[in-house]
Amino acid sequence: MSFWEYIVDRRDLLVFLSAQQFSMVVQCLIVATVIAVVVAALVYRNNTAVGLATATSAVGLTLPSFALLGLLVAVTGFGITPAVIALTFYAILPILRNTVVGLATVDSSLVDAAQGMGMSRLRILTRVELPMAWPVVMAGVRVSGAMIMGVGAIAAYVGGAGLGGEIFAGLSRLGGANALNSTLAGTLGIALLALILDLLLLGVSRLTTARGIRV
């Protein structure tokens, strides 16, 4: 069976698995963005906390995904739970780093002007600092989206949803019928999903960034 025939024959399953993976990644990305922005907003004025947050992000990104998933499986068991926790954890790291950097590099004269107008700390954060840092934040979100789309494939090994199952199914019967087709379908499907997600996030970034600071 050719690769195209394999795709046509299993199109319903492949579409379902693609939708599963895309949904899982997007939901984890939304949760991670909220957590990362809140944490960054709490720590960005404290140099020690900023250093700790960026160091944690750097160290966290070095953790092998298989090792983290294995640890989570030991605690939560197989299934979607360890996959969601791992994806959310990895997604938080680039967003947290970028948000902290973005907030810390906002022009201090803008903050001083806002304070002179009598704005509260929270109002300055939401009306001045966060909008100015938003392009940097969204750059982190795009990095996280591409990264966890790939991690999501590995998460299928512990019972996570998505196209990773096709890859592992093909690898498990390497040399057998349709093994290569299965592996290629999963790999190319994930690459396509990552591209689609990045384009969507680019659109969201442009729509939510103030016109005056769009690049």
Q: Which ranges hold each PLM region?
A:
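Loop-to-helix entry region at the N-terminal start of transmembrane alpha-helices
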Residues: 13-24, 73-94, 134, 182-186
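Generic alpha-helical transmembrane segments of integral inner-membrane proteins
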Residues: 22, 26, 30-38, 42, ...
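Short cytosolic juxtamembrane segments of multi-pass membrane proteins
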Residues: 205-215
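Cytoplasmic-entry segments and transmembrane alpha-helices of multi-pass inner-membrane transporters
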Residues: 39-72, 87, 95-101
